[in-house]
Amino acid sequence: MDLTKLTAHELKDMLSNKEVKAEEITKAFLDRINLVDNKLGAYLYVSEEEAIKKAKEIDVKIEKNEELKALSGIPIGIKDNINVKGMQNTCASKILEGYTSPYDAHVTEKIKQEEGIILGKLNMDEFAMGSSTENSAFKLAKNPWDLERVPGGSSGGSAVAVAGSEATLSLGTDTGGSVRQPASFCGVVGLKPTYGRISRSGVVAFGSTLDQVGPMGKDVEDCALLTSVIAGLDKKDFTTVDKEVPDYKKSLTKDIKGKRIGIPKEFFGDGLDKNIRKSVEEAIKVLEANGAEVKPCSLPLMDYALSAYYIISSAEASSNLARFDGIRYGYRSKNFKDAQDIYLKSRSEGFGDEVKRRIMLGTYVLSAGYYDAYYKKALKVRKLIKDDFQRVFKDFDAIVSPTSPTTAFKVGEKKDDVMSMYLSDIYTVPISVAGVPAISLPCGMVDGLPVGLQIISDYFKEDVLFNLAYSYEQSVDFYKMRADF
């Protein structure tokens, strides 16, 4: 039996029944990483010794018949912008090359408390800016379904690790679609929770009013399991909400009778691949057959979401990334005349092109002459988009759409076409702007590549997402798909 192909809940059952040891599971994944990651590029750092040490500790507890915790013995990969004490945290950027984190992010603490085994740090677009993981300063990540194609981004490594059987679960971050789009491209399940449901403490900031940590897994049950562990109030993050986290396992039922689902016409317009449209429409029929009430709806302001997103996120990035100055830590230019020169050269040499592009855009829209015309206007548009979603959720429990207008595109195909790259997030960005939760799960294949179905719900209604996603997933076989790599 190939342990790397199993889900987290299957491995949990085997550990509980003493059919396998945690060390055996961990070594199977480490062997897999050593075998395939030179081609897949999911990991930027592997913590082999520490992972085996933790696994042995869990095996001792199992031998003593101690009760297992939620993630005991489950191998997990962490995106390289989420702090793990003693491991690198580079954000896939030259400017943080060699930086080792002195503390754990809140989500990392929660995983460690539940005895998850952290295998290492995962590849990403630099500072989470990108949709293909081609912006990593260190190496390319490849899609396990086709090595000539991208895995999506910015959490490309997180999706590749799960799809390529290099981790059972992974954590990514989602600012404008960075968990959902790679989940779609790689055929795994990925959740962007409600803004405030999961702590951002210890996560390197890109867009502070948009960033959210999101789990990825092989199926909906795995995704719900990891969400249950990391969700909840954190006093170190004032944006988290003191709201009880439901038992998401209770939502994992096929019964969705009476659930009202809206189909927004704006998500099915020009630019959507006809085969993806067909796959999503077939998925909607399955939900309807399972008892959901499906009706059309409209979100007329969605056309403005992408523009508002890039103004707001770039403005926040410009502010957040000002802290990387070549003085206290990270990359410092070797040739400089004075302090001003250190800042200029360290940042110019340390940041990649896409990061510099967004810093420049953000600085521009925050400048005195353009603040009202761009940034302030974008915030007003954001409020209207939120109102749009609230209006729809008065009549519907959820909205269904494609996750991405295309399947995974080829490496290099959009790297130099900025607008085309940005448009690959056209169905995920509105959800981020509004701050509502959404999940992506596989709903078909087009030319050998996975297609993602996006289900969106109202604030803090992740339980509704898991219910609908599980109902659909268990009615089809797409969740059993594994990349033959």
From Swiss-Prot:
Catalytic activity: L-glutamyl-tRNA(Gln) + L-glutamine + ATP + H2O = L-glutaminyl-tRNA(Gln) + L-glutamate + ADP + phosphate + H(+)
GO biological-process terms attached to the record: translation
SUBUNIT field: Heterotrimer of A, B and C subunits.
PROSITE patterns, per database record: AMIDASES
Positions of the catalytic residues: K79, S154, S178
Chain's role: Allows the formation of correctly charged Gln-tRNA(Gln) through the transamidation of misacylated Glu-tRNA(Gln) in organisms which lack glutaminyl-tRNA synthetase. The reaction takes place in the presence of glutamine and ATP through an activated gamma-phospho-Glu-tRNA(Gln).
Pfam families reported in the protein's UniProt record: Amidase
Listed Gene3D superfamilies: Amidase signature (AS) domain (3.90.1300.10)
SUPFAM superfamilies cross-referenced by the UniProt entry: Amidase signature (AS) enzymes
Record GO terms (molecular function): ATP binding; glutaminyl-tRNA synthase (glutamine-hydrolyzing) activity
EC number in record: 6.3.5.7
One GO location term (cellular component): glutamyl-tRNA(Gln) amidotransferase complex
PANTHER family (UniProt xref): GLUTAMYL-TRNA(GLN) AMIDOTRANSFERASE SUBUNIT A (PTHR11895:SF151), TRANSAMIDASE (PTHR11895)
Protein name: Glutamyl-tRNA(Gln) amidotransferase subunit A
